From Swiss-Prot:
SUPFAM superfamilies: GINS helical bundle-like, PriA/YqbF domain. Belongs to the GINS2/PSF2 family. The keyword Transport does not apply. One of its GO terms (biological process) is chromosome segregation. It is found in: Nucleus. One of its GO terms (cellular component) is GINS complex. Its main location: nucleus. Keywords: Chromosome partition, DNA replication, Nucleus. Residues 262-271 have a biased composition (Acidic residues). InterPro entries: GINS_A (IPR021151), GINS_bundle-like_dom_sf (IPR036224), GINS_Psf2 (IPR007257), PSF2_N (IPR056784). Component of the GINS complex which is a heterotetramer of sld5, psf1, psf2 and psf3. The gene is psf2. Gene3D superfamilies: 1.20.58.1020, 3.40.5.50. This is DNA replication complex GINS protein psf2.
Amino acid sequence: MAFPLPRGITPPEIAFLAEMEMVTILPRQRLEGLELLGGQVEPLLPPRRASLPLWLALLLKRQRRANILPPAWLHPEPLSLILEIETQHHEYENAFSPPPPLPGQPSVRDRNRGQRPIARARHTPDGQRYFPSPPFLPQNIAQDNAHPSEPPSLPYHWLEVGNMLLDAASDDLVDPDQIRRLLKELREVRMAKIRSGVDVLDAAATGGGGVALTGVGAMEIGESRGFVTGVVDGLRKIGASKEQARREQMAEEMANGGYDATQDDEDEMEF
């Protein structure tokens, strides 16, 4: 007997998509440029840094041909600050820490300078314009010149990228044990917020509200999809039965009211 297909994308499929994230490596050997489906890979010339897809960087790491430089957010200090925002700031008590700005969205530095960012469109080989989105945004590359006013933020594939780098390149990370602990605590805190958001699903199921998912990661959405959709379906059925009972009650009241008014008119005519 075959099991029914799960709703939406599964966690292994999400992890597969996360392997397209661009990361920074420090090559140990020379490697000629490659033509991949996702685009051209520049030649690797030690000790010059290069940006590669995560799957290729992990392959070179396993072959001991490169070291992976951790992204700016995958350090103990930024993760501790994000965990503090998630747990101690009242404005994020029922919300998630802000994600990195997308192309065309102002950052903190842009707001301070009063500048308006410009979203730069890219073009396909046949000339069509498009705007990239994760995993095709540079949200996981190493940054040495990060602006101090920019608060740390978790990218869309933070959980997948962090676990992959901990498994395959823990020797390239700063204090991997603490990073693993912080990632676990962040996941528990954020999943608790998702589960606590069930209270507002009653209004969302009947079209009277919605659930804010700003800052939620891809794996978090994939893992909670079955739970949330099951709750919404159950609430929708309960709401439908309540609506049907309300309509029947209104119809009964209208019928009784119409009957009483007719009787009163007949009594007045007889009098």
